[in-house]
A protein has these predicted regions:
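Iron-sulfur-associated redox domains of electron-transfer enzymes in respiratory
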Residues: 1-240
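Generic structural signal for well-ordered, non-membrane alpha-helical segments
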Residues: 10-17, 258, 293, 306
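Alpha-helix boundary/capping residues
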Residues: 102-105, 255, 316
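Cysteine-cluster motifs in flexible loop/terminal segments that predominantly coordinate metals
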Residues: 149-173, 255-261, 268, 273, ...
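Ferredoxin-type iron-sulfur electron-transfer modules in oxidoreductases and energy-metabolism complexes
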Residues: 229-253, 260-329
């Protein structure tokens, strides 16, 4: 059974959520927490490790800015401190990458407390530079959470195509979609996790069924909207580039001297034995495990639409596998 709690966000939503995180840091007995953190000059934000609750005064998990997939620093931390308990505040695509790392034996999820935040989409560093600060972007995200966010075309292409913005495989979820997030949001977990982490003491009572149902309704609307955007973006690729496994593998081979797109992928190295000789089978496994974060496309110095290409190739592989499955009966 799921447990749903309301978190009243007034009068200062971001500060209120920081207090929730600080309380959770203590009740979960965390050794450290990986969370989006603003820079000292307030001009940028990126996932960073904090090892005391006081540092959460600069945390801002609602800023729709993605500089890197935080599954990578989570992996780095656990490799350096395998016995410590790490909390992570992540978006859906970051949690998907973290899950893949666990499945590949790279991360021990028993030493992770995952806090997943609804994602309405993210901007890259260019939008952040234009705004000058992540704070107005965070405030805008909360303002429009009730209707599922702003028009998706403003976000990075990978976010426009994401049809699963809900954080799965998280011990705790921060539910924003469909809710008046500047006033109140929902904190959800299993009943066991709620007891383990003392969520009833960190929140403001049980959430109403109306709030829970509204969140689910808007989630479905957002998924449908993203599906339409995905089809539009993939159709726009027609004739632009060869989009099959062999073409992508050949492209990766040509990029051997750069590999910037591969270095930012949090899971690529888990599938490839020799970076100088990526095989077709390794390429297929990597594509099928793609978390959809789009960091590869953001990093590509040739500005290739890699997230869209990978999305198309993944769909093609999935269709081919489905055709090989024997029909029931």
């Amino acid at each position: 059974m799921a447990a749903h709690f309301v978190l009243n966000m007034q009068p200062h939503p971001i500060e209120r959520f920081r207090r929730f995180l600080a309380g959770l840091y203590e009740t979960a007995h965390l050794d450290a927490l990986l969370v989006p953190l603003g820079s000292s000059d307030g001009t940028t934000i990126e996932p960073r490790i904090v090892d005391n609750a006081a540092e959460l005064a600069a945390a801002d998990p609602f800023a729709p800015v993605m500089i890197l997939n935080s599954a990578r620093p989570a992996l780095d931390y656990q490799q350096a401190h395998p016995d410590r308990l790490l909390g992570v505040v992540m978006r859906a695509c970051e949690l998907r990458a973290l899950t893949t790392l666990h499945e590949r034996g790279a991360i021990d999820m028993d030493r992770i407390v995952a806090i997943g935040v609804d994602c309405m989409g993210t901007f890259g560093p260019d939008e952040l530079a234009w705004r000058g600060s992540p704070q107005p972007l965070a405030e805008e995200a909360l303002q429009f959470a009730r209707q599922g966010g702003i028009n998706p075309y403003r976000y990075r292409p990978a976010c426009q195509m994401c049809i699963d913005p809900m954080p799965n495989n998280a011990a705790i979820t921060v539910d924003l979609l469909g809710l008046p997030a500047r006033k109140a949001i929902v904190i959800s977990s299993s009943e066991q996790s709620a007891r383990d982490f003392g969520l009833s003491n960190l929140t403001d009572g049980h959430a109403s069924s109306d709030m829970v149902e509204q969140h689910e309704r808007v989630r479905q609307q957002v998924n449908a909207r993203r599906s339409r955007a995905r089809e539009r973006l993939l159709q726009a690729l027609n004739g632009e580039l060869a989009m099959d496994v062999d073409s992508l593998a050949a492209h990766l081979a040509e990029c051997e001297t750069c590999q910037t797109c591969l270095s930012v992928c949090p899971i690529f190295e888990q599938f490839v034995a020799d970076l100088a000789n990526v095989t077709r089978d390794e390429t297929i496994q990597w594509i099928m495990a793609c978390a959809g974060c789009g960091m590869c496309e953001a990093a590509c110095v040739d500005h290739l639409p890699l997230a869209r290409i990978i999305n198309r190739v993944k769909a093609t592989i999935t269709e081919a596998l489905a055709e090989r499955m024997p029909a029931n009966g």
